[in-house]
Regions:
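Short, charge/polar-rich alpha-helical segments
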Residues: 30-43, 76, 104-120
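Leu/Val/Ala/Ile-rich N-terminal alpha-helices, chiefly Sec-type signal peptides and the beginnings
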Residues: 1-62
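Conserved small/polar residues in nucleotide/adenosyl-binding loops
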Residues: 152-154
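Helix-loop segments that flank and shape redox-cofactor active sites
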Residues: 55-71, 138-139
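Non-transmembrane amphipathic alpha-helical segments
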Residues: 44-59, 78, 85, 89, ...
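Short, charged, amphipathic alpha-helical segments
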Residues: 68-77, 141-150
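Soluble, cytosolic/nucleoplasmic coiled-coil alpha-helices used as oligomeric scaffolds and tethers
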Residues: 64, 88, 95, 99-102, ...
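Extended, charge-rich alpha-helical segments
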Residues: 90, 94-128
């Protein structure tokens, strides 16, 4: 299994596990061994799922300003946790490939590996939510078709 396939498998599991309760306050039950890359990938996606739903909550035009401020602080902490975890995942790669010597003409073609993995995690959430929109029965056929097209392009 490639590393990206491992990521996708774990991200999908975390995404579907989160949506069992669909609550930003639900405790995470990470099935992977503590301090393994699998554990960190699951945690990464869980943080992203919670953050996704924090953003939904804060966009509510009827949100109480006091609740909004408290939520903003939770979002800030979540962002810091996310960044710290990305750095930890990058450390995993630095250690794993510490003996590899780059070629003299090597170029950097992306962000760090962990930020690329971050994009895969967000992509898993986008795919999940687009599929939810496709399956809704309380929307128009046009909306569902548009979401189906969007999901196919994600």
């Amino acid at each position: 299994m490639t590393f990206s396939n491992l990521c996708n498998e774990i991200f999908w599991k975390s995404t579907t596990d989160y949506h069992v309760t669909d609550s930003v306050d639900a405790p995470m039950n990470n099935p992977y061994e503590l301090k393994t890359i699998e554990y960190y990938l699951y945690l990464k996606n869980w943080i992203d799922a919670v953050q996704w739903h924090f953003e939904d909550i804060i966009r509510d035009p009827q949100i109480d300003p006091v609740e909004a401020l408290a939520l903003k602080r939770r979002i800030d902490k979540s962002n810091q946790d996310r960044t710290d975890l990305v750095e930890l995942i990058d450390s995993y790669f630095l250690d794993k490939y510490k003996e590899v010597k780059p070629l003299s003409d090597a170029t950097i073609n992306t962000e760090s590996p962990a930020w690329a993995i971050d994009r895969l995690s967000i992509l898993a959430l986008k795919i999940y939510h687009m599929q939810q929109e496709v399956e809704r029965t309380d929307t128009t056929e046009e909306h569902r078709a548009q979401c189906q097209i969007g999901r196919a392009h994600v």
